[in-house]
Design a protein with these regions (language model features):
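A detector for small-residue-rich transmembrane helices and their helix-helix packing motifs
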Residues: 1-253
């Protein structure tokens, strides 16, 4: 017999129970460190919008001119960093709040599966994918926000569930995806940004988890190649953004 915290247990009973050890990042309901850092960066950039650009609680004029994706400024002014800064700036506090709430909910679920480094790489790939989609569909528009990256997380979550044999209907993501599809088609947001991020999330989901429950991850058990593939994806998408931005003049006509 073995002494337990309450009474005693027989050896056969204790041998059947495997002890689970939870860490800060694997504790159910906990928020991963990378998710917290990304939320902090978004909040910091929003604060800078007030300090540097005199933005009001909902003003988007000066902020958009300085941070947002725009083909003319990226291509003609050489402001390539907009591909990245556009994913951290927001059009007002409501826009910021919606995206950060989504990141707070979705981020930890995926981060616990991928780990903080791979999760951050995937997030940035989806962010740049969103910039590519936005510039591809409308290179003259001023677009910004974390929505592209958030849609990338949705794509990753879809594939993560599929790898576990859980369909969209079973996972509860169906209504969420339909709602976001409706929002994307409403004309008030960047359809290209949402679609670009989501497609990147789906592709990375195949790399990390496999296409479905019967498929292995693209690189099997290799722990290095998926990260290299994600980094290459970011570079390719960034170059794609530069190309898409260069189309601004043709969009004028």
């Amino acid at each position: 017999m073995h002494q337990a915290s309450v009474g005693v247990h027989c050896p056969e009973c204790t041998s059947k129970t495997k002890q689970k050890v939870y860490t800060r990042n694997t504790l159910p309901g906990s928020s991963g460190i990378a998710t917290q850092v990304l939320i902090g960066l978004n909040l910091a950039v929003f604060l800078l919008q007030f300090v540097l650009f005199d933005a009001t609680i909902s003003d988007d004029g000066r902020t958009a001119q300085e941070l947002a994706d725009n083909g003319f400024f990226i291509s003609e002014e050489g402001e390539w960093w907009r591909v990245f800064t556009s994913g951290f700036g927001h059009f007002g506090i409501f826009h910021l709040g919606m995206n950060m709430y989504s990141l707070h909910i979705l981020g930890p679920i995926i981060e616990r599966r991928l780990g903080p480094i791979r999760f951050t790489l995937a997030y940035m790939a989806a962010l740049v994918g969103g910039s590519f989609g936005a510039l591809l569909l409308d290179p003259l528009a001023f677009t910004m926000g974390a929505s592209g990256a958030i849609f990338g997380l949705l794509g990753l979550l879809v594939m993560m569930f599929r790898s576990q044999g859980i369909g969209i209907a079973q996972s509860g993501l169906g209504p969420v995806l339909l709602l976001n599809l409706f929002i994307s088609l409403s004309g008030f947001v960047s359809l290209g940004g949402h679609a670009g991020g989501f497609i990147v999330g789906i592709i990375l989901g195949v790399v990390y988890f496999g296409a479905d429950a019967r498929s292995a991850p693209l690189f099997g058990r290799d722990q290095v190649k998926p990260d290299i593939a994600t980094a290459v994806c970011i570079v390719v998408l960034f170059l794609g953004c530069l190309w898409a931005a260069s189309r601004w003049l043709s969009a004028v006509g």
